[in-house]
């Protein structure tokens, strides 16, 4: 690694330690040219997949869009923000576990619906009505039957 002080391309690692949580490595380095010491940290570069929209264009995964979807569906419902944050964390974890560079917006929508079904049945129906573009009452009753069936 290049020296942070003089730019020398060769430095020596004096000490390496794993962080307490195991997520990074701290390295103490010395430059043989200028004899200065500095610390570097090595962490895994984990990125969320790109979202492929239904129209075919791609965009960066935006956790705030997911949070907004939850908050709209859960508006005036008795669900704590802690539970919402945990649900969002589960979605992010699932997306990372997929190990894919791209994921469809449909997959994310289904993940949101699954989490809402766990959190609040009314919020699930609210979200489903917009997400699936319900056109009449029968689609609402179908969604209600679906959620009732899954909770038994």
UniProtKB/Swiss-Prot annotation:
ZnF segments: unnamed: 3-34
GO molecular function terms listed in the Swiss-Prot or TrEMBL record: ATP binding; DNA binding; zinc ion binding
Domain ATP-cone: 49-139
GO BP, one annotated term: negative regulation of DNA-templated transcription
Alphabetical UniProt keywords: ATP-binding, DNA-binding, Metal-binding, Nucleotide-binding, Repressor, Transcription, Transcription regulation, Zinc, Zinc-finger
One matching Pfam family: Zn_ribbon_NrdR
Cofactor remark from the record: Binds 1 zinc ion.
UniProt cross-references to InterPro entries, sorted A to Z: ATP-cone_dom, NrdR-like_N, RNR_NrdR-like
Cofactor(s) this protein cannot do without: Zn(2+)
UniProt keyword annotation of Thylakoid present: no
Function summary: Negatively regulates transcription of bacterial ribonucleotide reductase nrd genes and operons by binding to NrdR-boxes.
PANTHER family the UniProt entry points to: TRANSCRIPTIONAL REPRESSOR NRDR
Similarity annotation: Belongs to the NrdR family.
The protein's name: Transcriptional repressor NrdR
Lineage, opening ranks: Bacteria, Pseudomonadati, Pseudomonadota, Betaproteobacteria, Neisseriales
Gene this protein is translated from: nrdR
């Amino acid at each position: 690694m290049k020296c942070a002080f003089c730019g020398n391309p060769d430095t020596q690692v004096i000490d390496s330690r794993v962080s307490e949580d195991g997520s990074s490595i701290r390295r103490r380095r010395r430059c043989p040219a200028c004899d200065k010491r500095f610390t570097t940290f090595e962490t895994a570069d984990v990125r969320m997949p790109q979202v492929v929209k239904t129209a075919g264009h791609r965009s960066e995964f935006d956790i705030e869009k997911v949070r907004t979807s939850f908050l709209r569906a859960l508006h005036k419902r008795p669900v704590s923000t802690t539970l919402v944050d945990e649900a969002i964390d589960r979605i992010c974890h699932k997306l990372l576990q997929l190990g894919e560079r791209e994921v469809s917006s449909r997959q994310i929508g289904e993940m949101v619906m699954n989490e809402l079904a766990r959190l609040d049945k009314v919020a699930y129906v609210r979200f489903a009505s917009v997400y699936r573009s319900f056109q009449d009452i029968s689609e609402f009753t179908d969604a209600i039957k679906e959620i009732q069936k899954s909770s038994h």
